[in-house]
């Protein structure tokens, strides 16, 4: 059974481990280009998690951390927010955990935080992630063409 809760400092190591030996492009794929530098360190994860408006959540299968993601960029006036920096352990992928995690993050955003809309960005090549987001109800709202077309991406949105 999947459970989620806000991450604690001791769990940041798992996020770093999920990136070990994966390369810079993998880090960019799940975290974007601005939040972290390769190679990822616990200090970087800690600094990101402590930023105003960021809540880092961990997903667990029993007591084992298997995934992480943020609710961030909350606009209280517009009641909007973003889901950012989603990552899962390699052995937790393609088992339905991503869908469960997103559903729970969405529930927290809508029911506990009072948001009415969530958005996220995803690279066009990340077809598995796009399918997962669509299963939860996210829909593509915008396409962003980058100078390097490999990094073209979509904005997706889920409304309450």
Segments from the language model and where they lie:
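Extreme N-terminal starter segment of soluble prokaryotic enzymes
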Residues: 1-3
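Acetyl-CoA-dependent GNAT
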Residues: 6-12, 17-93, 102, 108, ...
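Aromatic side chains
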Residues: 12, 57-60, 97, 110, ...
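C-terminal "cap" of GNAT-fold acetyltransferases
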Residues: 81, 116-119, 123-130, 135-160
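Conserved glycine-rich acetyl-CoA-binding loop
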Residues: 85, 89-103, 107, 117, ...
């Amino acid at each position: 059974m999947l459970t989620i809760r806000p991450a604690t400092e001791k769990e940041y190591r798992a996020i770093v481990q999920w990136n070990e030996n994966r390369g810079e492009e993998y880090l960019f794929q799940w975290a974007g280009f601005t939040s972290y530098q390769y190679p990822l360190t616990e200090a970087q994860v800690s600094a990101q998690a402590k930023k105003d408006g960021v809540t880092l959540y961990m997903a667990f299968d029993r007591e084992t951390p298997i995934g992480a993601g943020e609710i961030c960029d909350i606009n209280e006036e517009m009641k909007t927010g973003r889901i950012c920096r989603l990552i899962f352990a390699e052995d937790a992928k393609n088992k339905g955990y991503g869908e469960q995690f997103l559903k729970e993050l969405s529930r927290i955003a809508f029911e506990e935080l009072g948001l009415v809309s969530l958005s996220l960005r995803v690279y066009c090549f990340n077809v598995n992630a796009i399918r997962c987001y669509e299963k939860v109800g996210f829909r593509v709202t915008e396409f962003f063409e980058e100078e390097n077309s490999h990094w073209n991406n979509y904005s997706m949105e889920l409304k309450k």
